[in-house]
Amino acid sequence: MDIKKIKAVVFDCDGVLFDTAQANRMYYNTLLDHFGKPDLSDEQFRLVHMFTVKEALDYLFPEMDSMESVYAFMKDMGYHSFIQYMNAESGLNELLEDLSRCGYARCIATNRTNTMADVLKIHDMGSLFEMVVTAADVKNPKPAPDELLKIMKTLHFSPEQILFVGDSEYDQLAAMSAGTWFAAFKNPLLIADCHVASMADIGKLLELKQDV
């Protein structure tokens, strides 16, 4: 990996920018409970963590011909009350400030849809990213490369100028298809150009402190 070519750092949201395990488990368990289903198993949660909302619902409610009642309850329930249980990754704000100071574009590529704006607003991070792309902004969400390709096209970057930081197989596949560099976050099982375990590791990788 040639770090000198990197001009932008793109982050996945869940499991990278934020520890969302508690919030997402509570959200989906509330949904499942309403329809008389048991709480998520660990394997179900692992998969739902990667999925778009539509994929998650198709997976959790395979017996339903229509998801109308599920979507109606989700609309009434909302996600806003669960955002408070999302914890920003330690060192995130410092890394984002260092990236900006050193001239890097900061972006998000996430399979979240209409909840992403609220997440950033509540955590006062709306102005900290140059571009945010969700599953709702592209035809094909991750593991397809569309989110990364949209960022590259809009900001005029080539694949070798992008470092994508993700924690799931979907992130890995998206990076491979888009041709970008890939940093696996807290997941040593992924195939990646590098593995990092903290926001500080990303700063060290890009040698940000040397630019002070």
Give the positions of each predicted feature.
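A generic alpha-helix signature
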Residues: A23, S69, T110-N111, K142, ...
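Asp-based, Mg2+/Mn2+-dependent phosphohydrolase catalytic module
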Residues: M1-A8, E97-S100, T113, D118-V212
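Ser/Thr-centric signal marking residues that sit
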Residues: V16, T20, T110, T180
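Residue-level marker of regulatory loop/turn positions in helix-turn-helix DNA-binding domains and
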Residues: A88, A109, N140
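N-terminal helical cap/lid subdomain that shapes the substrate entry/recognition surface
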Residues: D2-E94, D98-C102, G126
